[in-house]
Amino acid sequence: MKKIVFTGGGSAGHVTPNLAIIPYLKEDNWDISYIGSHQGIEKTIIEKEDIPYYSIASGKLRRYFDLKNIKDPFLVMKGVMDAYVRIRKLKPDVIFSKGGFVSVPVVIGGWLNRVPVLLHESDMTPGLANKIALRFASKIFVTFEEAAKHLPKEKVIYTGSPVREEVLKGNREKALAFLGFSRKKPVITIMGGSLGAKKINETVREALPELLRKYQIVHLCGKGNLDDSLQNKEGYRQFEYVHGELPDILAITDFVISRAGSNAIFEFLTLQKPMLLIPLSKFASRGDQILNAESFERQGYASVLYEEDVTVNSLIKHVEELSHNNEAYKTALKKYNGKEAIQTIIHHISEA
């Protein structure tokens, strides 16, 4: 039986692509383990998957000054020792890393044990963790073809993003019942990430009188962002977040308004949903969402509305453009084959 260790954490985006791959390896009888941090979100997610989870010390890697920068390098070194010992005991055939600060000690620990390391980078440009990990890895899978120019050619394999199978199995009838919607109007699903997006939430609610004339709205507004005055608004359903219902909601969705995090937008792409992307500004991020969104716009998958340009009028105008050019977006979206991502990654895992 072949063995694999997965790693990646710090945010859900560094975990969910692993969840897309793991079921296929289980079918092939791989022995699967996961190494992550003591308190990270990856621990909560993976322990639900009936996979052995091992914790190591970890320190965050920062590009900016913080007093924790004095302590965290020592935590990283402790993490490398923890990972080295754990990997020596597990004796995996390969390590698959999805990035995030906890992955660096695992990658180095694997390299010290002479275990092949495969990385996956979701964004157009590599994050700091993958930049460090790359020198210890044999291959790096990239989600965007354009990412290859930022990485060593001999290590790069373009795959796209692995998407969880359950996301693709939504039921429209269940969504209609859950939401209380009709079949008469198209559905727009709006999401701003797990914490929501204040400007998007406010603008959407201001635009509701106009939007609800033509559309039904599902608004995933983030924790603490519900508006009680709109709870009984016909054609409008708001949630802090949803879990098991999301595939059904996406099945009934005609258009998506979203941030431009890589994992989410590739789920929409695989489901062939035309998108209006409102990326995080450079003031709130390293600019990766802007690059992601612009790539999707160039390929005809999405329209982009920059956060600083978001108003009620601009939002309505972009939604109307999305609706008017729906067929053109659909034609472009059909060219992408999302299933190839998982197949390609599993092939290289098996060959490592």
Swiss-Prot record:
Read off the InterPro entries from this record.
GlcNAc_MurG, Glyco_trans_28_C, GlycoTrans_28_N
Q: Where in the cell is it found?
A: Cell membrane
| Topology class, membrane | Peripheral membrane protein
- Some GO term, biological process aspect, for this entry: which one? lipid glycosylation
Q: Name one GO cellular component term.
A: plasma membrane
Output the SUPFAM superfamilies linked to this UniProt entry.
UDP-Glycosyltransferase/glycogen phosphorylase
Family membership: Belongs to the glycosyltransferase 28 family. MurG subfamily.
Q: What does this protein do?
A: Cell wall formation. Catalyzes the transfer of a GlcNAc subunit on undecaprenyl-pyrophosphoryl-MurNAc-pentapeptide (lipid intermediate I) to form undecaprenyl-pyrophosphoryl-MurNAc-(pentapeptide)GlcNAc (lipid intermediate II).
Q: What is this protein called?
A: UDP-N-acetylglucosamine--N-acetylmuramyl-(pentapeptide) pyrophosphoryl-undecaprenol N-acetylglucosamine transferase 2
What is the organism field in this record?
Answer: Bacillus thuringiensis subsp. konkukian (strain 97-27)
Native organism taxonomy = Bacteria, Bacillati, Bacillota, Bacilli, Bacillales
